[in-house]
């Protein structure tokens, strides 16, 4: 990283040399602290499961200390869902638990329940310039896709808020995709600049330099061949029943070629379905395509429906059972907030001390 006005310039660069991939050895897993999470904008779908949820559970089971954030404050950057925010938050926790996250081993909490985390945003904002924020490609992209006539301040400072998310618990690893590296670079820059400006009296740094844990999961497209999205109607929700799953997959786009092959560039719709079946079967997508062969779109969709419903049957059963006790979901959030608040309060106290605040 360059020292001056480049918090977002690294958006055009590859991952840092110290970053890790999901298959890299972690050494002592218990020595690592991971921050990850989601915005509660709606139900999680199969893309979330194969892209992030599976890996979170794997890290948890290895003994990594996990912090899983329900980013409810970040939802209001670009939408007003006040009438559904509590429901979406509970359903997100429901998906987490059904997928295998264990609240005894993972701290699951909501932004709005941890005041000290959000208070870190103020000193952190003093460490980045307006020009740096305006160059952040993720912010630019979200602004371009926003329906708002004017961008609000919360959206504009979104990367710094994410830096506070990461640094409040002093996370040293952050699972991200390549497209999220610019946000992580902001957190790295904030940490470095804060440590340079406000070191401890003995020279110790307050914050670690967080590293990326780059996902090796293939991008699972939606049923229309485009990006899988909760808002585009091209995704199967984790909690969907088997009939709904079948209906959505039967309506997926394919092409006129009867021979089923796996070619994501030339045949994105067909290849997306093949990949979904392969992920559920834990097989190579080329082998799945070869097995279907000349069966055509109907055989492909049957295979996908059977594969998805079989793979997710245990998860969906757990989800249905957990859904009968909404009070437990709220208790998970309260317990997580208690742990997160203790850590955030200690971090804020340390920040105020090195800054010389009374």
Positions of the model-derived regions?
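N-terminal Rossmann-like or analogous alpha/beta NTP/dinucleotide-binding catalytic cores
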Residues: 2-164, 320
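Conserved nucleotide- and phosphate/pyrophosphate-binding catalytic cores
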Residues: 6-10, 188-358
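Short amphipathic alpha-helical segments, especially helix-boundary/capping motifs
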Residues: 29-33, 49, 66-72, 97-99, ...
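Generic detector of short, locally flexible boundary/turn motifs and exposed helical patches
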Residues: 31-35, 73, 133-135, 181-184, ...
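A generic structural motif
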Residues: 40, 174-175, 234
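Structured ligand/cofactor/substrate-binding pocket environments in proteins
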Residues: 44-51, 59, 65-71, 81-88, ...
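Short helix-capping/linker segments at secondary-structure and domain boundaries
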Residues: 64, 130-134, 168-175, 278-288, ...
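A generic secondary-structure signal for well-formed alpha-helical elements
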Residues: 93, 100, 128-132, 171, ...
């Amino acid at each position: 990283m360059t020292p001056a006005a480049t918090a977002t310039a690294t958006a055009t660069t590859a991952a840092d040399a110290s970053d890790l991939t999901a298959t890299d050895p972690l050494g002592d897993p218990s020595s690592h602290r991971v921050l990850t999470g989601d915005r509660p904008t709606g139900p999680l779908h199969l893309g979330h499961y194969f892209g992030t949820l599976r890996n979170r559970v794997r890290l948890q089971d290895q003994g990594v200390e996990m912090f899983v954030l329900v980013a409810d404050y970040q939802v209001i950057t670009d939408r007003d869902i006040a009438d559904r925010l509590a429901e979406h938050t509970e359903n997100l926790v429901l998906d987490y638990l059904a997928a295998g996250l264990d609240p005894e081993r993972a701290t699951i909490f909501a932004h709005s329940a941890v005041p000290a985390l959000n208070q870190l945003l103020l000193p952190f904002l003093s460490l980045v310039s307006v020009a740096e924020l305006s160059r952040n490609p993720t912010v630019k992209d979200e602004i371009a896709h926003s329906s708002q006539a004017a961008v609000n301040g919360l959206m504009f400072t979104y990367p710094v808020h994410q830096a506070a998310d990461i640094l409040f618990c002093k996370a040293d690893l952050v699972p991200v995709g390549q497209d999220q590296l610019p946000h992580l670079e902001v957190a790295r820059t904030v940490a470095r600049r804060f440590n340079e400006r406000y070191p401890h009296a003995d020279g110790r740094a307050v914050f670690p330099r967080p590293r990326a844990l780059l996902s090796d999961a293939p991008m699972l497209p939606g049923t229309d061949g485009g990006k899988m999205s909760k808002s585009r109607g091209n995704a199967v929700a984790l909690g969907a029943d088997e009939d709904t799953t079948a209906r959505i997959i039967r309506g997926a786009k394919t092409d006129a070629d009867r021979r089923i092959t796996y070619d994501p560039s030339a045949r994105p719709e067909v290849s997306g379905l093949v990949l979904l079946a392969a992920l559920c079967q834990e097989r190579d997508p080329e082998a799945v395509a070869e097995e279907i062969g000349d069966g055509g779109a109907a055989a492909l969709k049957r295979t996908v429906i059977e594969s998805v419903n079989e793979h997710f049957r245990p998860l969906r059963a757990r989800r249905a059972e957990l859904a009968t006790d909404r009070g437990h979901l709220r208790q998970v959030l309260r317990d997580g907030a208690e742990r997160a608040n203790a850590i955030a309060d200690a971090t804020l106290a340390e920040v105020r001390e090195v800054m010389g605040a009374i």
